[in-house]
């Protein structure tokens, strides 16, 4: 159990009885690997280096020094360390969550780099982000650049009754929807997005 902001959260630290679980599932399930049922081309990975803005760099250094000062001579909890790491990552993404819970935007180069990348790409694109704020920022910029009908979402704030419809729109070759933006926490598993030839990780998880 870890404590996040005064809230106790159960954390998985290991697994037990996996062989027993596997035996019980064998009677009514079978496993098929992706390469056994789909003829897919090899994946090609490409990294983009994005320079921090002066404002980002200043805030990042301030937060880093604060975290180091808190750590000196103290035993920090796992939750506290994760919170500091999360804030540093948020700053890299162009925002951070203040102590009062409000989200503060920071001038950054990510959205410009994303739009430049999209100009180079033909076909449909899946864009993953780690934070809901990032998803909403991406949606705002893509709608402005490509129109409101060009994009659908699949993340925590997407209503349950719209999620499957959004996938169908994205998968439909005649649909005007070209972009699907979501979080891997919500849409990273169990959905089919084979209409896309490109997948972009705008911000990674841990």
Language model region names:
Residues 59, 134-141, 192:
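Phosphate- and divalent-cation-binding pockets in alpha/beta enzyme and binding domains
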Residues 126-128, 136-139, 143-187:
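Conserved helicase ATPase core of P-loop NTP-dependent helicases/translocases
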Residues 15-22, 128-130, 182-184, 202-204:
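Short His-Asn-centered micro-motif
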Residues 43-45, 147-150, 195-198:
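Short glycine-/polar-rich loops that comprise or flank the Walker A/P-loop
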Residues 185-206:
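Conserved RecA-like helicase motor core of SF1/SF2 enzymes
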Residues 1-123:
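Inter-lobe coupling linker of SF2 helicases/translocases
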Residues 107, 130-133:
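Helix N-cap/beta->alpha junction signal
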Residues 89-92, 129, 155, 203:
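Short beta-strand/turn micro-motifs composed of small residues
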